[in-house]
Amino acid sequence: MPYITSQNAAITAERNWLISKQYQGQWSPAERARLKDIAKRYKVKWSGNTRKIPWNTLLERVDIIPTSMVATMAAAESGWGTSKLARNNNNLFGMKCMKGRCTNAPGKVKGYSQFSSVKESVSAYVTNLNTHPAYSSFRKSRAQLRKADQEVTATAMIHKLKGYSTKGKSYNNYLFAMYQD
């Protein structure tokens, strides 16, 4: 849980910085560089023109994933950390590697992302939920909660993960039941 909490703290700091700059007219070179870095990491297309910053997309992506939701999903995906994938690859979420980016080190599970640490696995997972096109509806639902001034919780978000599993809603129901226990 400390890794999830620290990841969310870093995201919150970036989000708060973005919110504080949203109506700023003048940008220093350091601020522009920071904004460019954030946009790149969150896969947000931006021309570099500070008058045309895609604020809605940025704020939709630069946001937390509820800690208890990430912990529940890690437990479900890794068999409470006992799976071969978790033990050998530090991969708690069953994240597959992309074509051409797979390394097949001895003792590792082939075809799946390998992480140097659990912290790196958590970071990659949170980034995936915040950037991958498949989770766009998840991010839009979270943004709607923000707009309605409601808290972003695991209870509110687990069922918003459309397309996360080939099992569909039954997997979301499984996660929700696991979270409730």
What is the predicted function of each stretch?
Residues M1-T72, A76-D181:
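Catalytic cores of secreted/periplasmic lytic hydrolases that degrade extracellular macromolecules
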